[in-house]
Amino acid sequence: MEGPGLGSQCRNHSHGSHVPGFGRHGICVHENKELAKAKEILPLIEDSSNCDIVKATQYGIFERCKELVEAGYDVRQPDRENVSLLHWAAINNRLELVKFYISKGAVIDQLGGDLNSTPLHWAIRQGHLPMVILLLQHGADPTLIDGEGFSSIHLAVLFQHMPIIAYLISKGQSVNMTDVNGQTPLMLSAYKVIGPEPTGFLLKFNPSLSVVDKTHQNTPLHWAVAAGNVSAVDKLLEAGSSLDIRNAKGETPLDMALQSKNQLISHMLRTEAKMRANKQFRLWRWLHKCELFLLLILSMITLWAVGYILDFNSDSWLLKGCLLVALFFLTSLFPRFLVGYKNLVYLPTVFLLSSIFWIFMTWFILFFPDTAGSPLYFAFIFSIMAFLYFFYKTWATDPGFTKASEEERKVNIVTLAETGSLDFRTFCTSCLIRKPLRSLHCHVCNSCVARFDQHCFWTGRCIGFGNHHHYIFFLLSLSMVCDWIIYGSFVYWSNHCATTFKEDGLWTYLNQIVACSPWVLYIFMLAAFHFSWSTFLLINQLFQIAFLGLTSHERISLLKQSRHMKQTLSLRKTPYNLGFTQNLADFFQCGCFGLVKPCIIDWTSQYTMVFHPAKEKVLRSV
């Protein structure tokens, strides 16, 4: 039963609605009238015993409403505005009153108001998901249309209530349902709502991209172009919308863009058309499949060319500088024209692999004669083999991507909604799944990752529950490889350069090693660069794992939160920090002669705390 709190309980009591960011597009004249009514604020009631039943319903004064109904008031009787009590209770999210009125014979789908809407329509306009759930559970029909011709899902889209959209579709509402004009929710979103959402959200439910409306024969892409909705156009093109379908006027989306003189959208459509046309050629398809390999070859050639120019037999550094600039210009053209945008994120990865390749070749060709048969030689070989193995394991191992079938997603959405948990803390609007504890959605991989640490651009993969331990050994082996090549460089200089640091001082020694072999100095600098960042990350990772029990994402999130808190937030006092030895045992999943036993947890399906349930709320906010 809802209490009669009178002040702030019903600030938004009328049957209007808010329009959250429609750009320049409105809905209708009636909508503005409803919106004006919604902004009215009822005066505070000091004595609720004398108020009428409409006002008592708006304020949620259950006892007063019950008293009047039991005295003979007909709950189906509309007021002067043709609005029923169920409408007023629905728009103000008075759950107990709705249950009471239904038990007293209220018509669940009674039409009323200026827009001839049902109580379900009113609840959706205001974004009251609990009320929507309650009305549907009592038999409300989501397919009914209001005076503007919109059904429930159309209204949820227009007012950008994503949880309600997800719930309606999961309960069986068709994502391709049309309004009186034959427009689907995707068409309305593309035309009425300027921005990427809810268009991107609807596309996750696999709506039809080729369906056309009754009047104009426009596809969703036509409507997005007509509205100048750049974000929606981008989403629809990414989803594979057709560029060739013509509307009733015989216009393609590109024709409409040219007619409206929207240069940005015209450029987007032309670029997409060119890319799709290129995919028809066998050579282009082959190049697309081999993009990463070609990028790796280009990177290896570029690194070799830089070293070759530096080692070129010329005393003119101006000439070498000009050659390096020309090389940089030429190599920048290949990724721009032949490598897709998605594969450009692998540039650091191919740079690392190319560096390791030339580090190995330098060791084998230049350093091998000075180290053959020594422990240094075998240590380097072991390090390079370990690096290749753990790089592959980090790359190939599933980091903990959370997966669910379409049916499982719908069941999860309904379950979360009906338990009051359908919010961004527990539900991923991109994957449409319930988020496990400590997970995060990676926008590069476009998937939720269990016990997410980071998306490492050096490996080109997410680091999570499945491959985090491989990542630690990857950093360790890379650090060892670079350490040995740095040591080998000093051995090479001591054997092949005519001077030493002790005899001639630093400046003369530096000049000599540059003149002795610019290539070795170049490889030394590459190794020093990779050694610096890999060692730093390794130390940072081991500190977080052993002393904090946190991932990189959790640590950064807690540090950000602490800036806005009055009291200092200790990173050590979290439910995941179980002490140095236990943290290491849990991370590497290994014990120590029975003294320490790891706690085996599958973070891909862990939704509640297992260590200290009282602290679950703290960690969910990380």
UniProtKB/Swiss-Prot annotation:
Domain DHHC: start-end pairs: 426-476
Organism from which the protein derives: Mus musculus
Tissue note: Expressed in most adult tissues, but at low levels in the liver, skin, and lung.
Name the UniProt record assigns to this protein: Palmitoyltransferase ZDHHC13
GO molecular function annotation: magnesium ion transmembrane transporter activity; palmitoyltransferase activity; protein-cysteine S-palmitoyltransferase activity
Pfam families: Ank_2, Ank_5, DHHC
Mutant lacking the gene: phenotype: Knockdown of the expression in mice through ENU-induced stop codon in the gene or targeted knockout of the gene result is similar phenotypes. Mutant mice are normal at birth, but by postnatal day 7 appear smaller. They display generalized hypotrichosis and hair loss with altered skin that is loose with wrinkling and folding. Kyphosis and osteoporosisis are also observed. Finally, a generalized amyloid deposition results in early death.
InterPro entries found in the cross-reference section: Ankyrin_rpt, Ankyrin_rpt-contain_sf, Palmitoyltrfase_DHHC
Gene: Zdhhc13
Subunit and interaction comment: Interacts (via ANK repeats) with CLIP3. Interacts (via ANK repeats) with DNAJC5 (via C-terminus). Interacts (via ANK repeats) with HTT. Interacts (via ANK repeats) with MAP6. Interacts (via ANK repeats) with SNAP23. Interacts (via ANK repeats) with SNAP25. May interact (via ANK repeats) with SPRED2.
Keyword RNA-binding recorded: no
